[in-house]
Protein backbone atom coordinates (compact mmCIF):
# COMPACT_ATOMS: atom_id res chain seq x y z
CA UNK A 1 0.00 0.00 0.00
CA UNK A 2 2.98 2.27 -0.56
CA UNK A 3 1.17 4.29 -3.21
CA UNK A 4 -1.51 5.32 -0.71
CA UNK A 5 0.99 7.19 1.44
CA UNK A 6 1.45 9.79 -1.31
CA UNK A 7 -2.28 10.50 -1.49
CA UNK A 8 -4.71 11.68 1.16
CA UNK A 9 -6.25 8.75 3.00
CA UNK A 10 -9.87 8.04 2.13
CA UNK A 11 -11.38 5.10 3.93
CA UNK A 12 -14.81 3.57 3.57
CA UNK A 13 -16.85 3.03 6.72
CA UNK A 14 -15.86 -0.65 6.71
CA UNK A 15 -12.17 0.24 6.38
CA UNK A 16 -12.52 2.82 9.16
CA UNK A 17 -13.89 0.07 11.46
CA UNK A 18 -10.88 -2.11 10.70
CA UNK A 19 -8.43 0.72 11.39
CA UNK A 20 -10.24 1.73 14.59
CA UNK A 21 -10.12 -1.87 15.83
CA UNK A 22 -6.39 -2.03 15.04
CA UNK A 23 -5.74 1.24 16.86
CA UNK A 24 -7.65 0.02 19.92
CA UNK A 25 -5.74 -3.26 19.80
CA UNK A 26 -2.44 -1.34 19.61
CA UNK A 27 -3.21 0.30 22.96
CA UNK A 28 -3.37 -3.16 24.57
CA UNK A 29 0.04 -4.22 23.25
CA UNK A 30 2.27 -4.68 26.32
CA UNK A 31 4.79 -1.97 25.41
CA UNK A 32 2.04 0.55 24.66
CA UNK A 33 0.09 -0.33 27.81
CA UNK A 34 3.24 0.40 29.84
CA UNK A 35 3.76 3.71 28.01
CA UNK A 36 0.16 4.76 28.68
CA UNK A 37 0.30 3.70 32.35
CA UNK A 38 3.46 5.74 32.86
CA UNK A 39 1.89 8.75 31.15
CA UNK A 40 -1.26 8.45 33.29
CA UNK A 41 0.84 8.16 36.45
CA UNK A 42 2.71 11.33 35.49
CA UNK A 43 -0.57 13.13 34.81
CA UNK A 44 -2.07 12.36 38.25
CA UNK A 45 -5.63 12.82 36.92
CA UNK A 46 -4.90 16.51 36.19
CA UNK A 47 -6.47 17.55 32.87
CA UNK A 48 -3.61 19.89 31.97
CA UNK A 49 -1.07 17.17 32.67
CA UNK A 50 -3.19 14.66 30.72
CA UNK A 51 -2.74 16.89 27.68
CA UNK A 52 0.98 17.18 28.41
CA UNK A 53 1.76 13.51 29.10
CA UNK A 54 -1.04 11.18 27.96
CA UNK A 55 -2.18 12.78 24.71
CA UNK A 56 1.26 12.72 23.03
CA UNK A 57 1.71 9.01 23.83
CA UNK A 58 -1.81 8.21 22.61
CA UNK A 59 -1.11 10.18 19.43
CA UNK A 60 2.12 8.25 18.81
CA UNK A 61 0.36 4.91 19.26
CA UNK A 62 -2.34 5.93 16.77
CA UNK A 63 0.26 7.22 14.30
CA UNK A 64 2.03 3.86 14.30
CA UNK A 65 -1.17 2.17 13.09
CA UNK A 66 -2.74 4.73 10.75
CA UNK A 67 0.40 5.42 8.72
CA UNK A 68 -0.12 2.02 7.05
CA UNK A 69 -3.45 3.35 5.74
CA UNK A 70 -2.10 6.46 4.03
CA UNK A 71 -2.31 8.96 6.87
CA UNK A 72 0.72 11.13 7.52
CA UNK A 73 2.82 10.04 10.51
CA UNK A 74 2.29 13.23 12.49
CA UNK A 75 -0.34 14.99 14.55
CA UNK A 76 -2.07 16.16 11.37
CA UNK A 77 -2.53 12.55 10.27
CA UNK A 78 -4.17 11.69 13.59
CA UNK A 79 -6.48 14.71 13.29
CA UNK A 80 -7.47 13.72 9.75
CA UNK A 81 -8.20 10.19 10.94
CA UNK A 82 -10.27 11.55 13.85
CA UNK A 83 -12.27 13.79 11.48
CA UNK A 84 -12.88 10.85 9.14
CA UNK A 85 -14.10 8.68 12.01
CA UNK A 86 -16.31 11.52 13.28
CA UNK A 87 -17.90 11.81 9.82
CA UNK A 88 -18.98 8.15 10.01
CA UNK A 89 -20.14 8.13 13.66
CA UNK A 90 -23.68 9.37 12.97
CA UNK A 91 -24.24 6.84 10.17
CA UNK A 92 -22.71 3.78 11.80
CA UNK A 93 -23.34 2.83 15.44
CA UNK A 94 -20.42 0.38 15.40
CA UNK A 95 -18.01 3.15 14.41
CA UNK A 96 -19.51 5.39 17.11
CA UNK A 97 -18.98 2.62 19.66
CA UNK A 98 -15.39 1.95 18.57
CA UNK A 99 -14.65 5.67 18.58
CA UNK A 100 -15.99 5.93 22.12
CA UNK A 101 -13.81 3.01 23.21
CA UNK A 102 -10.76 4.64 21.66
CA UNK A 103 -11.42 7.98 23.36
CA UNK A 104 -11.95 6.22 26.70
CA UNK A 105 -8.44 4.78 26.42
CA UNK A 106 -6.79 8.17 26.71
CA UNK A 107 -9.38 10.70 27.88
CA UNK A 108 -10.37 10.71 31.55
CA UNK A 109 -14.06 10.13 32.23
CA UNK A 110 -15.94 13.39 32.47
CA UNK A 111 -17.98 13.50 35.64
CA UNK A 112 -20.67 16.03 36.31
CA UNK A 113 -20.96 17.65 39.72
CA UNK A 114 -23.39 15.77 41.97
CA UNK A 115 -25.73 18.77 42.21
CA UNK A 116 -28.12 20.06 39.58
CA UNK A 117 -28.70 23.69 38.61
CA UNK A 118 -31.37 24.10 41.32
CA UNK A 119 -28.99 23.18 44.14
CA UNK A 120 -26.34 25.71 43.15
CA UNK A 121 -27.06 27.67 46.33
CA UNK A 122 -25.46 24.92 48.41
CA UNK A 123 -22.03 25.69 46.97
CA UNK A 124 -20.02 27.83 49.35
CA UNK A 125 -18.54 30.98 47.85
CA UNK A 126 -14.94 31.70 48.63
Swiss-Prot record:
Q: Which UniProt keywords apply?
A: Acetylation, Cytoplasm
Name the source's superkingdom: Eukaryota
Q: What are the record's GO terms for cellular component?
A: cytoplasm; nuclear speck
Annotated compartments: Cytoplasm
- Disulfide-linked positions: none
Biological process GO terms, please? camera-type eye morphogenesis; cognition; corpus callosum morphogenesis; post-embryonic development; psychomotor behavior; regulation of skeletal muscle contraction; third ventricle development
Q: Which residues carry this modification: N-acetylalanine?
A: 2
Presence of the UniProt keyword Cytoplasm in the record: yes
Tissue specificity note: Ubiquitously expressed, with higher expression in lung.
Q: Name one Pfam family in it.
A: P_C10
Q: What is the protein's known function?
A: In brain, may be required for corpus callosum development.
Family, as annotated: Belongs to the UPF0456 family.
Protein name in the entry:
Protein C10
Q: Which organism is it from?
A: Mus musculus (Mouse)
Q: What is the lineage of its organism?
A: Eukaryota, Metazoa, Chordata, Craniata, Vertebrata
Amino acid sequence: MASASAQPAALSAEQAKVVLAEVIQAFSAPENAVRMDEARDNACNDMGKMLQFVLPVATQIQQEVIKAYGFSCDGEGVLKFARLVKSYEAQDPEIASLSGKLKALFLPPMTLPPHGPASGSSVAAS
